[in-house]
From Swiss-Prot:
Stored PANTHER family: S-ADENOSYL-L-METHIONINE-DEPENDENT METHYLTRANSFERASES SUPERFAMILY PROTEIN
Coiled-coil intervals: none
Classification lineage: Bacteria, Bacillati, Bacillota, Bacilli, Lactobacillales
Enzyme Commission numbers on file: 2.1.1.-
Keyword S-adenosyl-L-methionine (UniProt): yes
GO cellular component, one term: cytosol
Protein name: Ribosomal RNA small subunit methyltransferase G
Record's keyword annotation contains Oxidoreductase: no
Annotated positions binding S-adenosyl-L-methionine: G79, F84, A130, E131, R150
Underlying gene: rsmG
Enzyme class at the top of the EC tree: transferase
Length: 243
């Protein structure tokens, strides 16, 4: 997917990027590739692949939750890595208030330099473990309209890291390449325990390749009990779903 095809694919869904936004995506790609030579940010480096599998893929969130396109919303990206999906969302929808938390300082450093280069405002970056960021005494707990994670971790693990950060009546969306029935069954009780309810499993395919994607939308229907998330490392070692 070259940049022109990226712009057209978004326009087909009613998302129109102006020249400045297109320039920001181009600058993002160039800086990502130059910095990737110094640190491991992504294994995807060809321009067409980055535009499709990182940029376009990130923006599928706004196809499933169209309110992201127009409303002022607080969005927390847990484990953003090289900035996906939060930085593409911020470029396309500048009114969003973005918070990024990542456990690796060098990735936060990259994102600090990137946001400065792209002149993005209302982007807060935190070097922290998600378990600590959403702990019971954290000022960030239950403070975001939307929390998202685009990660390979199991859904029950992601739910424990992310749902404590979601406001009442807010949403958590896990962006996954696949969502197996077994994973959803294992996560269902964990999601309920954490105050969530699975509202939608939005199945999509990427243009050109047809690669499958699942956006699992979870509504926050009640407060997360104070004992969650558990201490750093425990959610991964002892998932609530029992996997």
């Amino acid at each position: 997917m070259d940049p022109a095809a990226f712009v057209q694919a978004l326009a087909d869904h009613g998302i129109v990027l102006n020249d400045h936004q297109q320039d920001q995506f181009a600058a993002y790609y160039q800086y990502l590739i130059s910095e990737n030579e110094k640190m491991n940010l992504t294994g995807i480096t060809a321009e067409g692949d980055v535009y499709l599998k990182h940029f376009y893929d990130s923006l599928t969130l706004a196809l499933v939750l169209p309110e992201l396109q127009t409303q002022v919303m607080s969005v927390c990206d847990v484990g953003a890595g090289a900035g996906f999906p939060s930085i593409p969302l911020k470029i396309a929808f500048p009114q969003l208030k973005i918070t990024i938390v990542d456990s690796l300082q060098k990735r936060i450093g990259f994102l600090e330099r990137l946001t400065a280069r792209l002149e993005l405002t209302d982007v807060q970056l935190f070097h922290d473990r998600a378990e600590a960021f959403g702990a019971k005494k954290s000022p960030h707990r239950a403070s975001f309209d939307l929390v998202t994670a685009r990660a390979v971790a199991a859904l029950d693990v992601l739910a424990e890291l992310c749902l404590p950060l979601v406001k009442p009546q807010g949403r958590f969306v896990a962006m996954k390449a696949a969502a197996t029935p077994a994973e959803l069954i294992a996560a269902k009780s964990a999601i309920g325990l954490l105050g969530g309810k699975l509202a939608q499993d939005a199945a999509l395919t990427l243009p050109e390749t047809g690669d499958p994607r699942h956006l699992l939308v979870i509504d926050k229907v009640k407060p997360t009990p104070n004992k969650y998330p558990r201490k750093p490392g425990i959610p991964n070692k002892q998932p609530l779903g029992g996997a």
